[in-house]
């Protein structure tokens, strides 16, 4: 699949996959952003893109940022719809007790292209019964036993 990319800032970098087996590509910051502890920051990527109809871009947390700095994509996965043509931006949340400084060029998130499907919604009076029913939020337990 080919994705058209428009750089709208001189610091913008064209995304690339780091390894042959990578499903995600890195998204790079175009400016410095200081994110205070237990706060969020909006990080600009400096690119716009054009996806094929039937696909979306999911913006996901980089595992190293989560593990080493407790910094995550707040709405992970963030969705970039195929008809959006604006600048890609990432909402980062700093869950740590320390300031987190994003530097120009830092790989702050990863993008994954995913197929999308349109559902047809059918209103009904009652849903089919299942053994689970309406149980949720831990209703199936957490232990193996």
From Swiss-Prot:
Leading EC class: hydrolase
Catalytic activity: dUTP + H2O = dUMP + diphosphate + H(+)
GO MF terms, alphabetically ordered: dUTP diphosphatase activity; magnesium ion binding
Any single GO BP term: dUMP biosynthetic process
Taxonomic superkingdom: Bacteria
Keyword Metal-binding: yes
Signal peptide span: none
Cofactor(s) annotated in UniProt: Mg(2+)
Biological role stated in the UniProt entry: This enzyme is involved in nucleotide metabolism: it produces dUMP, the immediate precursor of thymidine nucleotides and it decreases the intracellular concentration of dUTP so that uracil cannot be incorporated into DNA.
Family: Belongs to the dUTPase family.
Name of the protein this chain belongs to: Deoxyuridine 5'-triphosphate nucleotidohydrolase
Encoding gene per record: dut
């Amino acid at each position: 699949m080919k994705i058209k990319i428009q750089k709208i800032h001189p610091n913008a970098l064209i995304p690339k996959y780091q390894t042959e087996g990578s499903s995600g590509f890195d998204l790079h910051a175009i400016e410095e952003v200081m994110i205070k502890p237990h706060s969020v920051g909006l990080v600009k990527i400096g690119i716009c893109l054009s996806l094929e109809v039937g696909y979306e871009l999911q913006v996901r947390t980089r595992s190293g940022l989560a593990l080493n700095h407790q910094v995550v994509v707040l709405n992970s996965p963030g969705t970039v719809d195929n008809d959006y043509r604006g600048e890609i931006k990432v909402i980062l949340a700093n869950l740590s007790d320390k300031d987190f400084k994003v530097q120009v060029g830092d790989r702050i998130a990863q993008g994954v292209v995913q197929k999308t499907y349109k559902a047809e919604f059918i209103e009904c009076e009652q849903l089919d019964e299942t053994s689970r029913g309406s149980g949720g939020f831990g209703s199936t337990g957490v232990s193996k036993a």
